[in-house]
A protein has these predicted regions:
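Short, intrinsically disordered, charge-balanced linker/junction segments flanking boundaries
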Residues: 1, 29, 202-206
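A noncatalytic interaction/capping subdomain that flanks phosphate/NTP-handling catalytic cores
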Residues: 5, 16-18, 23-186
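Short strand->helix junction
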Residues: 10-15, 148, 194
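Glycine-rich phosphate-binding P-loop
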Residues: 180-206
Length: 206
């Protein structure tokens, strides 16, 4: 706005009005999907820091929306060790600029943009969408601010998805399984959904 004012030799008294006009114009372009806002961290202080399988993650946003399932992994670490930052933003996204479809099924739709992936979760009503930089270092999840068991669980699954992306880039992978601790060792039972893994491990506990 200041550059425009100087270009057209406007008096400084016009600066506030000009700044508002420029901001409104950019907001309209963003809403129409003609431009996309830069994807960067908004918050300054993380709500939670945790380490999972050696991967250091910082979560930003409302601590009430973060699942207690993450508590066993809470751990402080230096900023230099951060592998991924995930930010929960409790407002709708400013635009609907999705890009090219990479994956689409009943659970999610993944779009590719020049600088990011955009993920929609059709079955999770409290999640508007999520934007992740292509290297996975930063994720912004647009979600509803309401704190409920369902909303927290949905966010847990979304956060897990983006963690697994970073894990894969670090040579790690996840196995769909159930496990029991027996004689000081973890025994892993792997198989597709519905095979009876949880039922089998429950029998071990009995």
């Amino acid at each position: 706005a200041e550059i425009l004012a100087r270009t057209y030799q406007l008096d400084e008294s016009y600066y506030p009005e000009l700044l508002k006009d420029v901001t409104d114009f950019l907001t309209q372009l963003t809403a129409m999907g003609m431009i996309t806002e830069d994807l960067h961290l908004i918050s300054s202080i993380p709500s939670v820091s945790m380490i999972i399988a050696g991967i250091c993650i910082k979560l930003y946003g409302s601590a009430e929306l973060i699942s207690p399932n993450f508590k066993p992994f809470y751990h402080e670490f230096s900023d230099d060790d951060t592998s991924q930052e995930i930010e929960l933003v409790t407002t709708p996204p400013p635009s609907r600029c999705y890009g090219q479809v990479l994956l689409q099924n009943s659970e999610m739709t993944v779009f590719e943009n020049p600088d990011r992936y955009v993920v929609l979760f059709p079955q999770m009503q409290n999640l508007y969408e999520a934007h992740m930089l292509k290297d996975g270092t930063y994720v912004r999840v647009y979600c509803h601010p309401q704190v409920s068991e369902t909303n927290i669980e949905n966010l847990f699954h979304a956060i897990r998805l983006f963690f697994l992306f970073t894990a894969q880039r670090n040579g790690l992978f996840a196995i769909h399984s159930a496990s029991v601790l027996y004689q000081g060792k973890a025994w892993l039972f792997s198989g597709h959904s519905g095979m009876g893994k949880s039922t089998h491990t429950a029998l071990w506990h009995e």
